[in-house]
Amino acid sequence: MFSLNTIAPALGAKRVGKRVARGIGSGFGKTAGRGHKGQKSRSGCKIKVSFEGGQTPLHRRLPKFGFKSRKSIVTQEITLFDLSRIPENVIDLNVLKKYDIVSRKIRFVKIIMSGTFDKPVIIRNLRISKGARDLIKSVGGRIEEGE
């Protein structure tokens, strides 16, 4: 009968660990496979991955570059296609958050022209690209700026 306490791995599936420093006959006696002297033979030996033998490591030889703007965390671009999915006529930041077009942490939004747009809407206090501005005005929309 098969039971949980009789389950065992297949023969040869588990390797037996190497028993080092257990006499000459084992093949790993005396120095335990570490060789004689030197940094790697000592206990507690751990050499950094980036260590290059005293030579200045690659990560310090290469120049620093770039940065991640913290402004990008609170800024997002949206397209006119995203606006066309909103049923309301007046669109501001709160409306975009309400319809999950932008996340809660976003504070600045820029509308860019992408796709077609044929709904006259009023855009309040949002940044807008020149192409998108022209398209919204051509379909009878309005852009209101300022607080």
Curated annotation (Swiss-Prot):
Pfam families: Ribosomal_L27A. Keywords: Ribonucleoprotein, Ribosomal protein, RNA-binding, rRNA-binding. The keyword Isomerase does not apply. The keyword DNA repair does not apply. GO terms for molecular function: rRNA binding; structural constituent of ribosome. Part of the 50S ribosomal subunit. Belongs to the universal ribosomal protein uL15 family. This is Large ribosomal subunit protein uL15. It comes from Blochmanniella floridana.
